[in-house]
Amino acid sequence: WIEEKSLIVGDLHLEKSTSYIDQGNFLPPYDTIDTLERLLNITKELSPNRIIFLGDVFHDNSAFDRLKKKEKQLFKDILKKNVIWVKGNHDNNFKYVNIKTYTSYKLKKFIFSHISDKKNKLEISAHYHPKVTFKFKGTKISKPCFLIDKEKIILPAYGAYTGGLNISSDIYKNVFLNDYQIYALGNTKVLKIEKKF
């Protein structure tokens, strides 16, 4: 958000890979370092005055305790910015020194929440991890995406191991009253995608 010098991200799901160990499943434990390094790099590049986290920063309430020393330092470096922390469904009991958490947050006319509420006007949310699948030069491609209409924006998940809910899901009909636009994350730019269902 250029006018407010704000960086808005959701669904980092830090330490998702290590959360599966208790279930006997092992994933390469590099999701947290990748996500934090990308976030720190973008904060250095854009120099926002504030970061607005739209929930599920951590995959569970004990994830912070599983961070390695380097990851904790990266996290602390990111938190040197002014932080608005909206709680998600995965980290709703997370507490960290000197960080106030919100169930939703209003800035100017916008409401920032983790899960979209149909009653909210001018809302920016996360939670659904939207993704779009399309063909490009005969190859099927799936990409995280923004979903945007006149009143709402749903952000793509920022975390490395987040997966996604395809835009063809009926769940999005419960969020958007109007038809929405799709903007997929490319390697170097955001691409508008035409809906063809």
Where are these regions (language model features)?
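Extended recognition/assembly regions associated with phosphoester-bond processing machinery
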Residues: W1-L54, F58-F197
